[in-house]
Amino acid sequence: MKAVVFEQFSAPPHIQQLPDPAPESHGVVVKVMANGVCRSDWHGWVGHDTDIQLPHVPGHELAGVVEAVGKDVKQWRIGDRVTVPFVGGCGSCPECHAGNHQVCDSQFQPGFTHWGSFAEYVSIHYADVNLVALPETLDFATAASLGCRFVTSFRAVVDQGQTSAGQWVAVHGCGGVGLSAVMIANAIGANVVAIDISEKALALARQLGATATVNAAKVANVVEAVADITRGGAHVSLDALGHPTTCFNSISNLRKRGKHIQVGLMLAENSTPAIPMSQVIANELEILGSHGMQAHRYGAMLAMIQSGKLAPEQLIGRRITLEQSIEALMNMDKFEGAGVTVVTAF
């Protein structure tokens, strides 16, 4: 198969011919029809993820067709249209038994713990636990865009944030994660204030339903700006970027008993941000994480997509080839363009 491979961290990846994968007894091989390019892939490429063993094939936002099936798989057949969460569970540990596959003790992450989907084929483990069937009405590019950013935002807004209609949601960072959160919060009737330093990103946030926007590069104090707009602070606030400044602002702009959801990865030098803990204590704030979403929770999200309440295809910015994905991957830290980039030609 053709795949993108890097043999050293931060060294330019290259296209290479590799043997086609064979399925594990409990897994399947998926023919990749579309694959998102995500900032998490960039973090892996520069060496921020200790699970990665070199040489490595990145990629974790995928959709495709089942190509081969392991002997112990019960629920899937060759030809099934599928996607998969970027964090998969083993199905047998205490967390999986409790339904929390996204924090599995032995989690499987294509593109991190194993070779990923910047390739023609990818091996997916524990298929009966982790695969998600795709409706025929959902195209592969849109389905691939769900795999990391959209589902993580869905879990952040809906499951972790318990957001309800009429509440104020602040979204710090309007990349793929943040724009997904804007769309999801708007769909359930919340009022959204989007914060970014890019007017292009903020314009897209408004198109996707943001009630108000704040350009963090142009206001003197982001927290005060959000407090003014929301008349007292957000009920739920997300750091969708993963930076000490956005994390601090997201916690600080909450109203009493509000919830901060950390969605953006905090790695390397950003892994220990300052937290206004006195405010957390005095105002009884909650700090939560969102790390993917279980396969069994996809149904609620897919139902909203099929009903038209969510339109994730609006987030797709560019469709590129596997060859073009190398440059796109290496430039993910530059936050160029708007929306989600998806590989659709292999």
Regions found by a protein language model. Name each.
Residues 1, 248-252, 294-346:
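C-terminal hydrophobic helical "lid"/dimerization subdomain
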Residues 19-35, 48-94, 135-138:
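Glycine-rich beta-strand-centered segment in the early N-terminal region that forms part
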Residues 33-34, 71, 87, 101, ...:
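Short, surface-exposed secondary-structure boundary micro-motifs
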Residues 82, 138-219, 224:
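Mid-domain Rossmann-like dinucleotide-binding core that forms the NAD(H)/NADP(H) cofactor-binding site
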Residues 90-172:
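NAD(P)H dinucleotide-binding glycine-rich loop of Rossmann-like/cofactor-binding domains
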Residues 244-307, 345-346:
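Glycine-rich phosphate-binding loop and adjacent beta-alpha segment
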